[in-house]
From Swiss-Prot:
Zn(2+) 1 binds at C159, C162, C212, C215. It holds the Pfam family DnaJ_CXXCXGXG. This is Chaperone protein DnaJ. One of its GO terms (biological process) is chaperone cofactor-dependent protein refolding. The gene is dnaJ. GO terms for cellular component: cytoplasm. Zn(2+) 2 binds at C176, C179, C198, C201. InterPro entries: DnaJ, DnaJ_C, DnaJ_domain, DnaJ_domain_CS, HSP40/DnaJ_pept-bd, HSP_DnaJ_Cys-rich_dom, HSP_DnaJ_Cys-rich_dom_sf, J_dom_sf.
Length: 386
């Protein structure tokens, strides 16, 4: 067998904490439950456990450091290898210590806080009430200016008959006979001894024998509540407002849950949102685009905005009106109003209009259509022989 320090991949001067951490990591990696039927993993697991058994014991480690593992022959658990998996598993369980140091075996097997095993569920400590979610629609204009909305929500509140105790009298609350008031029971599963919430009292440690008739022993009843929600200017769809303490009542003196308000901004008939900017498509005639004009455009700040459209303006041109967009919801600056030009091609022309357009077309020259001229020049260049 290789050197014990090499097996655990630690330095010879490693601290007990470093040795324990290294062992835990490797032991979980090669644990038989994670590697069923893998003989090599089983062998590695025994070697790792033997190395830890020696290096975690101060006296054995001193002997090993001075004289090697041969000097440990005959010592319990050291020097002669773990002949059975039971010995290795006992070392494994001892290393995790059932919660010593704030860690649990479930943290290493991917169980997080052990809740799926019942290790930390329940309990009699203060617990926060459940949080709630509501969706609220606001108009485009309300999102620009901000608005106050009234909501009606249903939350669990303390029963005003039993004051949240759940019992009609103090004599109606008894210590749980199953867990003797601990709120937890122990269960042995193979090599593992697990702590679970008591199934009789659900981790409370007490049972109610004389339940309150108003709340049916729950200690809380559902109540409707009218609340006012301030929607700040600049909100957008998908944003969330948190209202602390507007969820269900807490248990055992714990704080109430929170209310999360999810915003949905309704679309507008003529405006669109682009970040904090507001986009407006402005239709103008062919003549207005060619000759230029002045236009008054609407805004959501109730202020008339005038823009000057110069002659020769092309379709899709955007004019920017500063400060007429959405305010930043965090309070820093405002977006702009973007006016995008849409040049309409005339339809349903009269004979006279057609004649005039035909006459105009005959008078057009390359200088009137610079983009087309440039395009035709590129086409000629493309097809011309070298």
């Amino acid at each position: 067998m290789a050197d014990y320090y090499e097996i655990l991949e630690v330095a010879r001067g490693a601290t007990p904490e470093e040795i324990k951490k290294a062992y835990r990591k490797k032991a979980v990696q090669y644990h038989p439950d994670k590697n069923p039927g893998d003989a090599d993993a089983e062998k590695r697991f025994k070697e790792i456990s033997e190395a830890y058994e020696v290096l975690s014991d101060e006296k054995k480690r001193q002997v090993y450091d001075r004289y090697g593992k041969e000097a440990l022959q005959g010592a319990a658990g050291g020097g002669q290898g773990f002949s059975s998996m039971d010995e290795a598993l006992r070392t494994f369980m001892g290393a995790f210590g059932m919660g010593g140091g704030g860690e649990s075996i479930f943290d290493f097997f991917g169980g997080g806080n052990g809740a799926e095993f019942g290790g930390r569920e329940g309990g009699r400590g203060a617990r926060q009430g459940a949080s709630k979610r509501v969706n609220i629609n606001v108009s485009f204009e309300e999102a620009v200016k901000g608005v106050d909305k009234e909501l009606v929500i249903s939350n669990y509140a303390n029963c005003n008959v039993c004051n949240g105790k759940g019992s009609s009298s103090s004599q109606g609350i008894k210590t749980c006979s199953e867990c003797k008031g601990r709120g937890q029971v122990f269960e042995q599963r193979g090599f593992f001894s697990m702590t679970m919430a008591c199934p009789k009292c659900h981790g409370e440690g007490k049972v109610i024998t004389d339940p309150c008739k108003n709340c049916k022993g729950q200690g809380a009843v559902k109540e409707k509540q009218h609340i006012k929600v301030h929607i700040p200017a600049g909100v957008d769809s998908g944003m969330r407002l948190k209202m602390s303490g507007y969820g269900d009542v807490g248990q055992h003196g714990g704080p109430a849950g929170d209310l999360y308000v999810f915003i949905n901004v309704e679309p507008h008939e003529i405006f669109e949102r682009e970040g904090n900017d507001i986009l407006l498509d402005l239709p103008i005639s062919f003549a207005e685009a060619a000759l230029g004009c002045k236009k008054e455009v609407p805004s959501l700040t109730n202020r008339a905005c005038r823009i000057t459209i110069p002659e020769g303006t092309q379709n899709g041109k955007i004019f920017r009106v500063k400060g007429e967009g959405f305010p930043n919801v965090h309070g820093h600056g405002k977006g702009d109003l973007l006016v995008r030009i849409f040049v309409e091609t005339p339809t349903r022309l009269s004979e006279r209009q057609k004649e005039l357009l035909q006459e105009f077309s005959e008078l057009e020259g390359p200088n009137n259509l610079p983009k087309r001229k440039g395009f035709l020049d590129k086409i000629k260049e493309f097809f011309s022989p070298n």
